[in-house]
Every structure is written in C-alpha cells, then in structure tokens.
A protein has these predicted regions:
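Short beta->alpha connector loops of Rossmann-like oxidoreductase domains
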Residues: 57, 134, 195
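Alpha-helical recognition/docking segments in bacterial nutrient-uptake
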Residues: 2-9, 67-178, 182
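An alpha-beta-alpha
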Residues: 176-196
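N-terminal helix-turn-helix DNA-binding module of bacterial transcription factors
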Residues: 1-69
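Short beta-strands and strand-loop turn motifs
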Residues: 27-31, 74, 154-157, 188-192
Length: 196
C-alpha cells in the first residue's frame, strides 16, 4: 500500500485480502461473516491476511473516521443468559456519557461452543479494547489478540495472558446458606440458568 504526500493512504480491499490468503473474495466474505461455512484452516488464513494487511470492512470505514471516540467491543452470550445481560448493562452504565462507543457481539451459549465468533472477527482498526464475558478463550484466539496488541479483559473465565474479573460463586453460595440458616431455614431450593 503506497501513500503519496498530501493524499490519504489507499484502503486495503477484499481483493487484496483474498490474494494474500490465496482464496476467492467470496471465501473471504464467508470467513468474516459466516465462519461456520469455511474450514478452521481457511478461516485462519483469511484472518492472518486481514491482520497482516490491516483490512477494515467497508461497513467499519465510517466508524474509522470518527474523531475522539473510543470503541470497546463486548463479546457475550447475553441472549442466552440473563445474568450476562445484567453485566452488559453494567458496562453500558459505566461508560455513561463518555465518548466511547460500545459494540456488542452476541455469542451463542458458551456451553455449546468456545469462541467461533471471536475467532472470526476482523479486529484490526475496529476496536480499542475488548471485553469477553463468559466465553472460554481458545489459544489461537488468545494468540491473535496478543499479536494485535488489542487490550482485552475476560469476565468469568481465566487465561494466563489476560486480566480477568470473576464472581466467587463458592463464597457467595456459602454466605447465602449461612444467612438462611441463621434465620431458621433448613430446606433450600435453587433456581439458576441452564447451561445450554
């Protein structure tokens, strides 16, 4: 990609990504938009090309032009688990009226899959940081995030290379039980979210 003095740098195109990855443009599109329709190996080749070239999809070009606005991505199974939706609400409240755009990516239940959506996101230039809630982080995805230098925080999952925030379910359960026993209750019921 060449840059002339006084001119904006040319934008990387999907054609260049396809050439770099050695695939067709339709394969690039599938790998980025419906990753389940391509093999893991092909998807990884496309993502490597996206990262190497700094490709930003056209729909994100306008967002790239924003001035003074940060962009945080939140990847979470929020439609699968009400508790995750409440955490997402907490993130939105914390951002408040700060000049930060929050982009939410809904991930199917983490009980069904690890992070295929995260593995397929074209991250270059799109986000300033990422919050990953309740989704195990595959090593290939962790390596990609580290390679891009994209700051990421995990919620309710652990990975040695990333900061994380956790609820202490054991202590919480013990405190609830102690509270109920102190009030004379002896038979308990539990209502929770199904892990589907």
């Amino acid at each position: 990609m060449e840059e002339s003095r006084g001119q904006l740098p040319s934008r990387v195109t999907i054609y260049e990504v396809a050439a770099e990855a050695g695939v067709s443009i339709s394969t690039v599109s599938l790998a980025l938009n419906t990753p389940a329709r391509v093999s893991i190996r092909t998807r990884q080749r496309v993502l490597d090309a996206v990262d190497a070239l700094g490709y930003t999809p056209k729909t994100e070009a306008v967002a790239q032009a924003r001035k003074g606005v940060g962009r945080i991505g939140v990847l979470a199974p929020y439609t699968s688990y009400p508790s995750v939706a409440r955490r997402l609400t907490g993130v939105l409240r914390a951002v408040g009226d700060k000049p930060v755009e929050v982009v939410v990516f809904d991930q199917e239940s983490s009980a069904k899959s690890a992070s295929p959506l995260l593995a397929s996101l074209p991250l270059t230039g799109r986000l300033d940081g990422l919050i990953i809630m309740s989704i195990p982080l595959e090593e290939s995805v962790a390596g990609r995030l580290l390679g891009l230098g994209l700051p990421a925080v995990l919620v309710d999952v652990r990975h040695p290379d990333f900061d994380s925030v956790h609820t202490d379910d054991v202590t919480g359960g013990r405190l609830v039980a102690e509270h109920l026993v102190e009030r004379g209750h002896r038979r308990f019921g539990f209502l929770g979210e199904s892990q589907q």
